Amino acid sequence: MTTGRLSMAEILEIFTATGQHPLKFTAYDGSTAGQDDATLGLDLRTPRGATYLATAPGELGLARAYVSGDLQAHGVHPGDPYELLKTLTERVDFKRPSARVLANVVRSIGVEHILPIAPPPQEARPRWRRMANGLLHSKTRDAEAIHHHYDVSNNFYEWVLGPSMTYTCAVFPNAEASLEQAQENKYRLIFEKLRLEPGDRLLDVGCGWGGMVRYAARRGVRVIGATLSAEQAKWGQKAVEDEGLSDLAQVRHSDYRDVAETGFDAVSSIGLTEHIGVKNYPFYFGFLKSKLRTGGLLLNHCITRHDNRSTSFAGGFTDRYVFPDGELTGSGRITTEIQQVGLEVLHEENFRHHYAMTLRDWCGNLVEHWDDAVAEVGLPTAKVWGLYMAASRVAFERNNLQLHHVLATKVDPRGDDSLPLRPWWQP
Protein backbone atom coordinates (compact mmCIF):
# COMPACT_ATOMS: atom_id res chain seq x y z
CA MET A 1 0.00 0.00 0.00
CA THR A 2 2.86 2.38 0.68
CA THR A 3 4.89 1.94 -2.55
CA GLY A 4 2.46 1.77 -5.51
CA ARG A 5 -0.03 4.40 -6.52
CA LEU A 6 -2.75 4.70 -3.88
CA SER A 7 -6.48 4.93 -4.42
CA MET A 8 -8.34 7.69 -2.62
CA ALA A 9 -9.93 5.18 -0.23
CA GLU A 10 -6.49 3.82 0.65
CA ILE A 11 -5.29 7.36 1.32
CA LEU A 12 -8.23 7.93 3.63
CA GLU A 13 -7.39 4.66 5.37
CA ILE A 14 -3.77 5.74 5.84
CA PHE A 15 -4.79 8.95 7.57
CA THR A 16 -7.10 7.22 10.01
CA ALA A 17 -6.00 3.69 10.70
CA THR A 18 -3.54 0.85 10.61
CA GLY A 19 -4.08 -2.89 10.70
CA GLN A 20 -7.47 -4.60 10.91
CA HIS A 21 -10.40 -2.39 11.86
CA PRO A 22 -14.21 -2.44 11.61
CA LEU A 23 -14.57 0.50 9.22
CA LYS A 24 -15.32 0.83 5.53
CA PHE A 25 -13.65 3.54 3.46
CA THR A 26 -15.03 4.78 0.15
CA ALA A 27 -13.93 7.64 -2.08
CA TYR A 28 -14.96 9.80 -5.01
CA ASP A 29 -12.80 7.81 -7.44
CA GLY A 30 -14.94 4.71 -6.81
CA SER A 31 -12.33 2.97 -4.67
CA THR A 32 -13.02 1.16 -1.39
CA ALA A 33 -10.94 -0.10 1.50
CA GLY A 34 -11.50 -1.61 4.90
CA GLN A 35 -14.27 -3.99 5.92
CA ASP A 36 -17.08 -4.32 3.35
CA ASP A 37 -19.83 -5.20 5.83
CA ALA A 38 -18.88 -2.59 8.42
CA THR A 39 -21.78 -0.53 9.77
CA LEU A 40 -19.51 2.46 10.32
CA GLY A 41 -17.47 4.17 7.67
CA LEU A 42 -16.00 7.26 6.08
CA ASP A 43 -16.54 8.50 2.53
CA LEU A 44 -14.05 10.89 0.92
CA ARG A 45 -16.27 12.79 -1.47
CA THR A 46 -14.06 15.36 -3.22
CA PRO A 47 -10.46 16.13 -4.23
CA ARG A 48 -10.62 19.09 -1.83
CA GLY A 49 -11.09 16.64 1.02
CA ALA A 50 -7.93 14.82 -0.02
CA THR A 51 -6.11 18.15 -0.02
CA TYR A 52 -7.26 18.87 3.53
CA LEU A 53 -6.04 15.45 4.67
CA ALA A 54 -2.67 15.80 2.95
CA THR A 55 -1.89 19.38 3.97
CA ALA A 56 -2.83 19.01 7.65
CA PRO A 57 -2.29 15.34 8.55
CA GLY A 58 -4.04 14.37 11.77
CA GLU A 59 -7.12 15.64 13.55
CA LEU A 60 -7.10 19.11 11.98
CA GLY A 61 -7.14 17.84 8.40
CA LEU A 62 -9.84 15.31 9.22
CA ALA A 63 -11.90 18.02 10.89
CA ARG A 64 -11.55 20.37 7.93
CA ALA A 65 -12.67 17.70 5.49
CA TYR A 66 -15.57 16.65 7.72
CA VAL A 67 -16.85 20.13 8.55
CA SER A 68 -16.68 21.21 4.90
CA GLY A 69 -18.68 18.16 3.80
CA ASP A 70 -15.78 16.68 1.83
CA LEU A 71 -15.59 13.76 4.28
CA GLN A 72 -18.83 12.09 5.30
CA ALA A 73 -19.42 9.69 8.19
CA HIS A 74 -21.73 6.70 7.78
CA GLY A 75 -23.60 4.82 10.49
CA VAL A 76 -23.91 7.77 12.90
CA HIS A 77 -25.93 10.97 13.17
CA PRO A 78 -23.84 14.14 12.64
CA GLY A 79 -25.23 15.48 15.91
CA ASP A 80 -23.76 12.52 17.79
CA PRO A 81 -20.96 10.66 15.98
CA TYR A 82 -19.96 9.03 19.28
CA GLU A 83 -19.99 5.40 18.09
CA LEU A 84 -17.71 6.19 15.16
CA LEU A 85 -15.28 8.21 17.28
CA LYS A 86 -15.28 5.57 20.00
CA THR A 87 -14.51 2.91 17.41
CA LEU A 88 -11.73 4.99 15.90
CA THR A 89 -10.25 5.66 19.34
CA GLU A 90 -10.53 2.16 20.77
CA ARG A 91 -9.93 -0.07 17.74
CA VAL A 92 -7.84 2.06 15.40
CA ASP A 93 -4.39 3.55 15.91
CA PHE A 94 -4.46 7.18 14.87
CA LYS A 95 -1.14 8.21 13.42
CA ARG A 96 0.73 10.79 11.44
CA PRO A 97 2.08 8.94 8.39
CA SER A 98 5.83 8.65 7.92
CA ALA A 99 7.64 10.92 5.47
CA ARG A 100 7.95 8.03 2.99
CA VAL A 101 4.24 7.28 3.12
CA LEU A 102 3.37 10.98 2.84
CA ALA A 103 5.55 11.23 -0.26
CA ASN A 104 3.59 8.40 -1.84
CA VAL A 105 0.33 10.08 -0.85
CA VAL A 106 1.50 13.24 -2.62
CA ARG A 107 2.36 11.30 -5.78
CA SER A 108 -1.01 9.56 -5.71
CA ILE A 109 -3.06 12.69 -5.10
CA GLY A 110 -1.09 14.79 -7.54
CA VAL A 111 1.01 17.83 -6.76
CA GLU A 112 -1.80 20.12 -7.89
CA HIS A 113 -3.90 18.86 -4.95
CA ILE A 114 -1.36 19.31 -2.15
CA LEU A 115 -1.02 23.08 -2.17
CA PRO A 116 -2.63 24.56 0.98
CA ILE A 117 -6.16 25.84 0.48
CA ALA A 118 -8.40 28.02 2.62
CA PRO A 119 -9.92 26.17 5.58
CA PRO A 120 -13.67 26.19 6.24
CA PRO A 121 -14.92 29.60 7.42
CA GLN A 122 -15.87 28.09 10.80
CA GLU A 123 -12.16 27.73 11.63
CA ALA A 124 -10.47 30.31 13.85
CA ARG A 125 -7.16 31.77 12.76
CA PRO A 126 -3.96 30.06 13.96
CA ARG A 127 -2.53 31.32 17.24
CA TRP A 128 0.18 33.44 15.62
CA ARG A 129 -2.40 35.33 13.53
CA ARG A 130 -4.56 36.07 16.58
CA MET A 131 -1.94 38.60 17.68
CA ALA A 132 -4.08 41.20 15.89
CA ASN A 133 -6.58 40.72 18.73
CA GLY A 134 -3.91 41.32 21.39
CA LEU A 135 -1.46 39.24 23.37
CA LEU A 136 -2.49 35.78 24.53
CA HIS A 137 -5.15 36.10 27.28
CA SER A 138 -5.25 39.89 27.13
CA LYS A 139 -8.73 41.29 27.71
CA THR A 140 -9.34 42.03 24.02
CA ARG A 141 -8.10 38.65 22.83
CA ASP A 142 -10.03 36.75 25.52
CA ALA A 143 -13.16 38.65 24.52
CA GLU A 144 -12.70 37.59 20.89
CA ALA A 145 -12.08 33.96 21.89
CA ILE A 146 -15.22 33.92 24.02
CA HIS A 147 -17.21 35.54 21.21
CA HIS A 148 -16.07 32.80 18.79
CA HIS A 149 -17.56 30.02 20.91
CA TYR A 150 -20.26 31.45 23.15
CA ASP A 151 -21.98 33.99 20.91
CA VAL A 152 -23.11 31.39 18.36
CA SER A 153 -26.84 31.75 19.08
CA ASN A 154 -28.86 31.63 22.28
CA ASN A 155 -31.53 29.64 20.44
CA PHE A 156 -28.92 27.07 19.47
CA TYR A 157 -27.69 26.77 23.05
CA GLU A 158 -31.25 26.36 24.32
CA TRP A 159 -31.70 23.37 22.00
CA VAL A 160 -28.39 21.78 22.98
CA LEU A 161 -28.25 22.55 26.71
CA GLY A 162 -31.92 22.25 27.53
CA PRO A 163 -33.99 24.42 29.89
CA SER A 164 -31.18 24.88 32.43
CA MET A 165 -29.02 26.75 29.88
CA THR A 166 -26.03 25.38 31.76
CA TYR A 167 -22.89 24.74 29.74
CA THR A 168 -20.82 22.97 32.39
CA CYS A 169 -20.62 19.46 33.79
CA ALA A 170 -23.73 18.28 35.60
CA VAL A 171 -23.57 16.17 38.77
CA PHE A 172 -25.87 13.17 38.45
CA PRO A 173 -27.37 12.02 41.77
CA ASN A 174 -27.90 8.62 40.16
CA ALA A 175 -27.59 6.98 36.75
CA GLU A 176 -31.29 7.47 35.97
CA ALA A 177 -31.42 11.22 36.68
CA SER A 178 -32.30 13.59 33.84
CA LEU A 179 -29.92 16.27 32.63
CA GLU A 180 -32.08 18.96 34.24
CA GLN A 181 -32.08 17.16 37.58
CA ALA A 182 -28.32 16.73 37.37
CA GLN A 183 -27.68 20.41 36.59
CA GLU A 184 -29.89 21.50 39.49
CA ASN A 185 -28.04 19.03 41.70
CA LYS A 186 -24.70 20.52 40.60
CA TYR A 187 -25.79 23.99 41.68
CA ARG A 188 -27.13 22.60 44.95
CA LEU A 189 -23.79 20.90 45.63
CA ILE A 190 -21.75 24.03 44.93
CA PHE A 191 -24.12 26.15 47.02
CA GLU A 192 -23.72 23.78 49.97
CA LYS A 193 -19.95 23.48 49.60
CA LEU A 194 -19.72 27.27 49.78
CA ARG A 195 -21.85 27.29 52.98
CA LEU A 196 -24.05 30.02 51.59
CA GLU A 197 -26.92 31.40 53.65
CA PRO A 198 -29.63 34.01 52.91
CA GLY A 199 -28.05 37.46 52.94
CA ASP A 200 -24.57 36.23 51.97
CA ARG A 201 -22.74 37.67 48.96
CA LEU A 202 -21.52 35.49 46.08
CA LEU A 203 -19.35 36.39 43.09
CA ASP A 204 -19.72 33.96 40.16
CA VAL A 205 -16.98 34.56 37.58
CA GLY A 206 -17.54 33.26 34.07
CA CYS A 207 -21.21 32.92 34.95
CA GLY A 208 -22.49 31.93 31.51
CA TRP A 209 -26.24 32.38 31.25
CA GLY A 210 -26.50 32.85 34.99
CA GLY A 211 -27.58 29.41 36.19
CA MET A 212 -25.62 29.60 39.44
CA VAL A 213 -26.55 33.26 39.84
CA ARG A 214 -30.26 32.51 39.73
CA TYR A 215 -30.02 29.37 41.86
CA ALA A 216 -28.25 31.25 44.66
CA ALA A 217 -30.60 34.24 44.41
CA ARG A 218 -33.64 31.96 44.72
CA ARG A 219 -32.18 30.90 48.06
CA GLY A 220 -31.75 34.47 49.27
CA VAL A 221 -28.10 35.11 48.36
CA ARG A 222 -26.97 38.38 46.79
CA VAL A 223 -25.05 37.54 43.61
CA ILE A 224 -22.95 39.24 40.97
CA GLY A 225 -22.25 37.19 37.85
CA ALA A 226 -19.70 38.25 35.23
CA THR A 227 -19.38 36.93 31.67
CA LEU A 228 -17.38 38.07 28.65
CA SER A 229 -20.15 36.95 26.30
CA ALA A 230 -22.58 39.71 25.36
CA GLU A 231 -25.20 37.15 24.30
CA GLN A 232 -24.93 35.29 27.60
CA ALA A 233 -25.19 38.49 29.63
CA LYS A 234 -28.27 39.65 27.75
CA TRP A 235 -30.02 36.29 28.15
CA GLY A 236 -28.94 35.85 31.77
CA GLN A 237 -30.01 39.31 32.94
CA LYS A 238 -33.40 38.89 31.31
CA ALA A 239 -33.80 35.53 33.07
CA VAL A 240 -32.96 37.23 36.39
CA GLU A 241 -35.60 39.88 35.74
CA ASP A 242 -38.19 37.36 34.54
CA GLU A 243 -37.82 35.43 37.81
CA GLY A 244 -38.18 38.59 39.88
CA LEU A 245 -34.65 38.31 41.27
CA SER A 246 -33.32 41.73 40.28
CA ASP A 247 -33.09 42.90 43.90
CA LEU A 248 -30.64 40.10 44.63
CA ALA A 249 -28.83 39.25 41.41
CA GLN A 250 -27.26 40.69 38.30
CA VAL A 251 -25.48 39.24 35.27
CA ARG A 252 -22.85 41.64 33.95
CA HIS A 253 -21.21 41.74 30.54
CA SER A 254 -17.77 42.11 32.05
CA ASP A 255 -14.29 40.66 32.25
CA TYR A 256 -13.89 39.09 35.67
CA ARG A 257 -10.85 41.33 36.15
CA ASP A 258 -13.12 44.39 36.03
CA VAL A 259 -15.24 43.41 39.04
CA ALA A 260 -14.45 46.11 41.60
CA GLU A 261 -16.48 44.88 44.58
CA THR A 262 -14.76 42.94 47.38
CA GLY A 263 -15.64 41.24 50.65
CA PHE A 264 -17.66 38.38 49.17
CA ASP A 265 -18.58 35.46 51.39
CA ALA A 266 -17.90 33.10 48.51
CA VAL A 267 -16.58 32.98 44.95
CA SER A 268 -17.54 30.34 42.40
CA SER A 269 -15.64 29.76 39.17
CA ILE A 270 -17.56 27.18 37.14
CA GLY A 271 -15.86 26.49 33.82
CA LEU A 272 -13.76 29.67 33.52
CA THR A 273 -10.29 28.40 34.44
CA GLU A 274 -9.98 26.64 31.06
CA HIS A 275 -9.91 30.06 29.37
CA ILE A 276 -7.42 31.76 31.71
CA GLY A 277 -4.09 30.39 30.52
CA VAL A 278 -1.80 28.38 32.79
CA LYS A 279 0.78 31.16 33.09
CA ASN A 280 -1.95 33.46 34.37
CA TYR A 281 -3.05 31.18 37.22
CA PRO A 282 -1.10 33.12 39.90
CA PHE A 283 -2.87 36.36 39.01
CA TYR A 284 -6.21 34.63 38.53
CA PHE A 285 -6.33 32.83 41.85
CA GLY A 286 -4.77 35.82 43.59
CA PHE A 287 -7.53 38.01 42.18
CA LEU A 288 -10.24 35.61 43.35
CA LYS A 289 -8.65 35.53 46.80
CA SER A 290 -8.71 39.34 46.89
CA LYS A 291 -12.48 39.27 46.34
CA LEU A 292 -13.09 37.12 49.44
CA ARG A 293 -13.56 38.23 53.00
CA THR A 294 -11.42 36.46 55.57
CA GLY A 295 -13.06 33.09 56.13
CA GLY A 296 -14.68 33.15 52.70
CA LEU A 297 -14.76 30.11 50.42
CA LEU A 298 -13.74 29.51 46.79
CA LEU A 299 -15.09 26.69 44.61
CA ASN A 300 -13.15 26.14 41.38
CA HIS A 301 -14.84 23.79 38.88
CA CYS A 302 -12.84 23.07 35.73
CA ILE A 303 -11.80 20.54 33.11
CA THR A 304 -8.29 19.16 33.61
CA ARG A 305 -5.81 16.83 31.99
CA HIS A 306 -5.43 13.37 33.51
CA ASP A 307 -1.85 14.20 34.53
CA ASN A 308 0.33 17.22 35.23
CA ARG A 309 2.92 16.61 32.50
CA SER A 310 0.96 16.96 29.25
CA THR A 311 1.09 20.15 27.23
CA SER A 312 -1.48 22.71 28.30
CA PHE A 313 -2.38 23.75 24.76
CA ALA A 314 -5.35 22.21 22.99
CA GLY A 315 -5.01 20.11 19.84
CA GLY A 316 -5.53 21.57 16.39
CA PHE A 317 -9.26 20.83 16.13
CA THR A 318 -10.14 22.15 19.59
CA ASP A 319 -8.01 25.28 19.23
CA ARG A 320 -9.29 26.20 15.75
CA TYR A 321 -12.93 25.13 15.98
CA VAL A 322 -14.00 24.97 19.61
CA PHE A 323 -12.02 26.90 22.24
CA PRO A 324 -9.44 29.24 20.71
CA ASP A 325 -6.62 29.87 23.20
CA GLY A 326 -8.04 27.33 25.66
CA GLU A 327 -5.54 25.63 27.97
CA LEU A 328 -5.80 22.67 30.33
CA THR A 329 -3.50 21.27 32.99
CA GLY A 330 -3.73 18.61 35.68
CA SER A 331 -5.62 18.94 38.95
CA GLY A 332 -2.31 18.88 40.82
CA ARG A 333 -1.24 22.11 39.11
CA ILE A 334 -4.61 23.71 39.89
CA THR A 335 -4.37 22.76 43.57
CA THR A 336 -0.77 23.96 43.80
CA GLU A 337 -1.57 27.34 42.26
CA ILE A 338 -4.49 27.84 44.67
CA GLN A 339 -2.20 27.06 47.59
CA GLN A 340 0.55 29.31 46.26
CA VAL A 341 -1.63 32.41 46.57
CA GLY A 342 -2.27 31.62 50.24
CA LEU A 343 -5.63 29.87 50.12
CA GLU A 344 -6.09 26.66 52.11
CA VAL A 345 -7.35 23.74 50.03
CA LEU A 346 -10.07 21.88 51.91
CA HIS A 347 -11.44 19.33 49.46
CA GLU A 348 -11.07 18.05 45.91
CA GLU A 349 -13.05 15.58 43.81
CA ASN A 350 -13.24 14.32 40.24
CA PHE A 351 -16.49 14.21 38.23
CA ARG A 352 -15.19 12.91 34.89
CA HIS A 353 -17.87 10.22 34.54
CA HIS A 354 -20.52 12.87 35.14
CA TYR A 355 -19.12 14.97 32.29
CA ALA A 356 -19.27 12.01 29.91
CA MET A 357 -22.95 11.61 30.84
CA THR A 358 -23.55 15.36 30.43
CA LEU A 359 -22.06 15.29 26.93
CA ARG A 360 -24.14 12.24 26.08
CA ASP A 361 -27.28 14.19 26.92
CA TRP A 362 -26.17 17.34 25.08
CA CYS A 363 -25.56 15.27 21.94
CA GLY A 364 -28.99 13.72 22.40
CA ASN A 365 -30.51 17.19 22.54
CA LEU A 366 -28.65 18.24 19.39
CA VAL A 367 -29.92 15.19 17.52
CA GLU A 368 -33.48 15.87 18.70
CA HIS A 369 -33.33 19.49 17.51
CA TRP A 370 -31.04 18.90 14.53
CA ASP A 371 -33.16 20.49 11.82
CA ASP A 372 -33.77 23.63 13.90
CA ALA A 373 -30.10 23.82 14.87
CA VAL A 374 -28.93 23.55 11.25
CA ALA A 375 -31.41 26.22 10.18
CA GLU A 376 -30.13 28.50 12.96
CA VAL A 377 -26.33 28.16 12.67
CA GLY A 378 -25.75 26.26 9.41
CA LEU A 379 -24.76 22.66 8.77
CA PRO A 380 -20.97 23.08 9.19
CA THR A 381 -21.26 24.72 12.63
CA ALA A 382 -23.80 22.15 13.78
CA LYS A 383 -21.41 19.39 12.67
CA VAL A 384 -18.56 21.00 14.62
CA TRP A 385 -20.66 20.79 17.76
CA GLY A 386 -21.65 17.18 17.26
CA LEU A 387 -18.05 16.24 16.55
CA TYR A 388 -16.56 18.14 19.48
CA MET A 389 -19.10 16.97 22.07
CA ALA A 390 -18.92 13.32 21.02
CA ALA A 391 -15.11 13.41 20.95
CA SER A 392 -15.07 15.03 24.39
CA ARG A 393 -17.35 12.30 25.72
CA VAL A 394 -14.86 9.69 24.54
CA ALA A 395 -12.00 11.64 26.16
CA PHE A 396 -13.74 11.73 29.55
CA GLU A 397 -14.69 8.06 29.36
CA ARG A 398 -11.10 7.08 28.57
CA ASN A 399 -9.69 9.29 31.36
CA ASN A 400 -7.87 11.60 28.97
CA LEU A 401 -9.86 14.46 30.48
CA GLN A 402 -11.24 14.98 33.97
CA LEU A 403 -13.47 17.50 35.76
CA HIS A 404 -12.39 18.64 39.21
CA HIS A 405 -13.89 20.62 42.06
CA VAL A 406 -11.36 22.27 44.35
CA LEU A 407 -12.73 23.91 47.50
CA ALA A 408 -10.52 26.40 49.33
CA THR A 409 -10.79 29.04 52.03
CA LYS A 410 -9.14 32.34 52.94
CA VAL A 411 -7.98 31.73 56.50
CA ASP A 412 -7.14 34.51 58.94
CA PRO A 413 -3.50 35.22 59.90
CA ARG A 414 -3.75 32.83 62.87
CA GLY A 415 -5.04 29.99 60.71
CA ASP A 416 -8.60 30.08 62.04
CA ASP A 417 -11.36 29.21 59.57
CA SER A 418 -14.36 28.46 61.84
CA LEU A 419 -15.29 25.50 59.64
CA PRO A 420 -16.73 22.13 60.71
CA LEU A 421 -14.29 19.27 61.19
CA ARG A 422 -15.89 17.16 58.46
CA PRO A 423 -17.56 17.91 55.09
CA TRP A 424 -20.84 19.74 55.65
CA TRP A 425 -22.54 19.13 52.31
CA GLN A 426 -24.61 16.29 50.95
CA PRO A 427 -22.63 14.45 48.21
From Swiss-Prot:
Alphabetically, which GO biological process terms does the record hold?
lipid biosynthetic process; methylation
Matches recorded under InterPro entries: CFA/CMAS, CMAS, SAM-dependent_MTases_sf
Give the enzyme's EC designation: 2.1.1.-
Provide the Gene Ontology terms for cellular component. Answer: peptidoglycan-based cell wall; plasma membrane
UniProt keyword list = Lipid biosynthesis, Lipid metabolism, Methyltransferase, S-adenosyl-L-methionine, Transferase
- Give the main EC class: transferase
Alphabetically, the GO molecular function entries are: cyclopropane-fatty-acyl-phospholipid synthase activity
Pfam families noted in UniProt: CMAS
Provide the binding site for S-adenosyl-L-methionine.
167-168, 202-210, 227-232
Query: What's this chain's function?
Result: May be a S-adenosylmethionine-dependent methyltransferase involved in fatty acid metabolism.
Protein family membership: Belongs to the CFA/CMAS family.
Name assigned to this protein: Probable fatty acid methyltransferase Rv3720
Its lineage reads:
Bacteria, Bacillati, Actinomycetota, Actinomycetes, Mycobacteriales
